[in-house]
Structure formats: structure tokens, C-alpha cells
Amino acid sequence: VSVIKLVNIKKSNAFQQQLNTLNDVYLNNAYSNQFIWQDGKASFEFSNAQKKFKSGKKSFLGAAISYNANFDAAGNVLYGLRRTQDTLNGQYQFLDLSYAQFVRLDNRYVLAKKLNLNSSIHFKAEAGAGIPYGNTKTSLPYDYSFYAGGSNDNRGWRARALGPGAYKYHLDTNRTLTQIGDIRIGASLEYRFSLGETLKGAIFTDVGNIWTYNEDSRNAQFKIQNMIREMALAAGFGLRV
């Protein structure tokens, strides 16, 4: 079943002026109005049964594993039709709007292992990639882009404040304009332990980053030889209720 989306980003004059000043092809495409004809979407999810193990008079859950994957493809049907072409940027259009063409795959693996009644270890790995091609020669649309940082990702950075690649600078005060990408790799390892009946402590390590699929002015393209040294690492301690 095809899903049709019209991405209409309402940009303030100041925001548009900043885009014009940056003159970045990648960002201009990511924040442009686009017609998205989603050719197909597929999802897969697996979760094992959590078995209980006894320790004296009490019982606790053993290892729990979950995996889910999501695949999206867009623009291929419209590209096959190739209606009208915008002579200014060379893109084909539908309803006078350039349409996006890409494939995107996102994977998430989670392992939770109870060590004893008062402690557990948690591991998470995520990897995703989107490939813009055909009618989209620069980047994924904003709605399908990846970002890094935040409480559910790399906790050493604010949400959308990490990357892409070795890029170190924020060109906007809100730190959201430039920190998007087409590829994401990340993992976290966390040890949780009881500090009482309602309070738990957590020691964690997070690693990961985002990259662009194509080369851009920020030198943020994903390259195997640079991947390890461009990984961002954070470690810390937290409290959970």
C-alpha cells in the first residue's frame, strides 16, 4: 500500500536567510518542500519469551532479547512515470513539486540480562542507513533523516547536537540545523543496580554518530576508514526510579 506525504516545512524568514547564507546543498534539500510517494514499507519485530528463574523464595527474569527492523522505499513509481522536469534543478516533479526518491533501513537490537535480584545489564545497538538516488541526489528528506544525541541515544550530547561525522561546529544557536544525516550507528551498555526499594543507580557508556551518504561541504560523508575515530564516546552515572 502506497503512502503519500506532502512535506511542507514552514520556515521563518530568519531560518531561510540562514539556509541561504550557508548555501549548503545537503541542508537545502533536507529542509525543502517535497512530495513523498512511499512505494512500500516493511517491518519485522522479534522478542523472545522472558523466562523466570528462582533464587531462594524470589524469582526474576532471565535474559530478554528484542530486534526490530523497518524498511522504507519512496519515489520509484513516480520516477518510472517521469512526468514533468524542472529545468532549473533537473529534478522531475509531480503536482509541481519535486519528489523524493530513496530507500531506508533501520535496525535496533536490545538485550537485557538480570544478573541477580538487585542488578542487571542492558545493551542496545542501532544501525540505520538511507540512500538517496535517482530524483534525490543529495540527502534524505528531513522526516526520514537520522540524528544523534539525547536521553535515548548518546547521552553525552543534547538531542540532534552530535555529528555528522567529525563535524565540530554548530552553525545555528539551537544546534538543530546541521546535525542530521543519512547513516546512523550507535550502541550503549548500561549496568543498573538497586539503591533501595524505589531508587536505582546506572553506570553507562554510549558510543555512536551519524554521517551523510553523499559528500557535502562539511566533510561529513561516511567512510569506513574514518568510522572508528569519528565515533563519539560518552560515559556517566545516573539515577532511575
Predicted ranges, named:
Residues V1-F193, F204, W211-Y213, A220:
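C-terminal outer-membrane beta-barrel translocator/porin domains of Gram-negative envelope proteins
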Residues S66, Q93, L111, K200, ...:
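In a subset of proteins, long, contiguous C-terminal domains/tails are tracked
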Residues A148-G156, S217-V241:
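C-terminal beta-signal and terminal closure region of outer-membrane beta-barrel proteins
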Residues D182, E197-L199, R229:
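Hydrophobic alpha-helical transmembrane segments and adjacent short intramembrane/lumenal linkers
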